[in-house]
């Protein structure tokens, strides 16, 4: 709206403002469209209801309007913004922006109509109270194929993961097109990490984790340890710094803001070893050994928040331990190894507590949504402790190997740097050291 007012007034120095707004609007439009489509999907029982029901027809009309908004925004982005240096083009921008605002008002009105209309999926009959709480029927007894190949859509994590993978691939392609090298191993690591996140949140394990403590712990260990390790080794911030174009003049673009963020006090706090240790490891106790766990499992928003906490806390921890991306205060390698071993010890104690527990974990949730094949809730909690104990060792061993390799390469780089320095100054540092030793020896003889 502000840009439309400036254009109507024919303020000439508005091109840069329009370019900045265009990038922000693109992100907002994408998120709005994806969230709206996902929200509409959950309210339809079958795809054909988008044409056969009043709710579906309203939804379809809103989608078409969003497509129209996207087309208008694309015209402004590709044909108008670059020519905003003249007042005549500013008037064209004002007219198109006014049309865009009109379409947006209609779309908002349709959104209000959708919010006050009853969707087709309003009453779904379930065989038990537990299934009605879940929102889906109990999954069958777990099998390898059911856990790995099963599917239950989680639009938030699926779309977010695909966007993250796409942005990384775009950055990689930009570097390659420019003739710059980027390790293929980092690309593979990032895509594998994204795949693990999608599997944890959209595959069969996501349904089973809501009815079984043991299988929940399997998903927890995977999204907290394996996925962050792979994502961190992808070095997304480093890729972004190399792929993004520097801003012109004194203005800040995405690359400059990212550089500021990586060296800001915010990142300094979130990458502090004490902070990441508390959030990543001790957070286990505050979540699983209190009523908070059962309460979060009983809330859809709470469950999503818990998964986000697992993923983000794991990412921050492994960024400090094995991260390639720059950060304000890198931890020395011996400190990284110590932090990792401390985390392993505290995590092992947590697993022992679960295995020695006399009562099932979160009975206020898992006791209600218990499927027929979970015959012993206490044994199920014991299985969760065994999973936490066993699976924590494999990622930890992998991370220890990575730290060892990084430490060795760091020593090699330091040795090479010293050799180059010696070649430049004739080994002045070593000669000064020998002279100092000779002076000390001469002092000892004279005394």
Protein language model annotation of sequence segments:
Residues 1-447:
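Alpha-helical membrane segments of multi-pass proteins
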